[in-house]
Amino acid sequence: MLKGIDPRLNADVLYVLRAMGHGDYLIVADTNFPSDSIARETVYGDLLRMENITAGEAAEAILSVYPLDTFVDDFACRMEIVGKPDEVPPVQQEVQDAVDAAEGEPRKMIGVERFAFYDMAKDAYAVIQTGERRFYGCVMFRKGVVPPDA
């Protein structure tokens, strides 16, 4: 156990979040996402797990230590609902709320078509599978930078 670090972040997840560099991106996936097979194609190459928590809870924990990229529009993306690309289901709204809280202001996640999201995920640094059972609980976070102390 460590002080000041969200206990939902296990050692493997913390290692990967720290190892990632500016512009690398992370997939946070629900239980229905083909996480294991896609994770094998990522930079890290193994599936990470944050089981027994929702996508929103995972996002909250991850974003407590992980800076989002402020230089790009696609700092965070969500998998679009097939046939309803503009609809944001509650599971994605919970993640959006975590993003807004971490950023201190509203920053809207960009929608990505389902199969395009799968393709994007293969180029990610890593995939974290959560315990989220609601459909479309899949998002991407692009890593930003931590500025130097003033």
What is each PLM-predicted segment?
Residues 4, 70, 145-147:
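Conserved phosphate- and dinucleotide-binding cores of soluble alpha/beta proteins
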Residues 4, 8-12, 21, 53-57, ...:
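Conserved active-site and cofactor/substrate-binding residues in soluble primary-metabolism enzymes
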Residues 83-150:
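Glycine-rich, aromatic-bearing surface loops/beta-hairpins
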